[in-house]
Amino acid sequence: MMAGMKIQLVCMILLAFSSWSLCSDSEEEMKALEADLLTNMHTSKISKASVSSWKMTLLNVCSFVNNLNSQAEETGEFREEELITRRKFPTALDGFSLEAMLTIYQLQKICHSRAFQQWELIQEDVLDAGNDKNEKEEVIKRKIPYILKRQLYENKPRRPYILKRGSYYY
């Protein structure tokens, strides 16, 4: 009886080690994919003048994936446990749905990575800065008082003769 338990224990240990090695390979692939994506983003971040189409596509894909998650959570008819089990185990397990689920999971991991979120904030700042400049120009084009126009522009240092003028009156 002891020999049978030892064989089962050895089989369990071998199974655990093999599954850990498979998981580490997929994690390494995900880290390599994420690193490649982030290096491409970092090198392209240097030219902030225009946002390339693949970056905007990636932002759109991430927002789409987040919308899918939020729609599934907004149904509210199911408890969270049922929703999680439905998400993990679809009704028809064919090769296409498994591959699609894996792709969506990888996209979620990339979109939720901290470095990508920081890059996304930088890109939003660049886009918002472009919009702010256009809004300032529109405000300036309207007829507004001179003082308000002066406040919109960056403050210039005061001229020295204005500061020295007070000493002449003493």
UniProtKB/Swiss-Prot annotation:
One of its GO terms (molecular function) is neuropeptide receptor binding. GO terms for biological process: blood vessel diameter maintenance; negative regulation of gene expression; neuropeptide signaling pathway; positive regulation of gene expression; positive regulation of phosphatidylinositol 3-kinase/protein kinase B signal transduction. GO terms for cellular component: axon terminus; extracellular region; transport vesicle. It is found in: Secreted; Cytoplasmic vesicle, Secretory vesicle. Keywords: Cleavage on pair of basic residues, Cytoplasmic vesicle, Secreted, Signal, Vasoactive. The keyword Secreted applies. It comes from the Eukaryota. Residues 1-23 form the signal peptide. The keyword Signal applies. It holds the Pfam family Pro-NT_NN. Its main location: secreted. The record marks 160-162 as: Cleavage. Neurotensin may play an endocrine or paracrine role in the regulation of fat metabolism. It causes contraction of smooth muscle. Belongs to the neurotensin family. Interacts with NTSR1. Interacts with SORT1. Interacts with SORL1. This is Neurotensin/neuromedin N. It comes from Canis lupus familiaris.
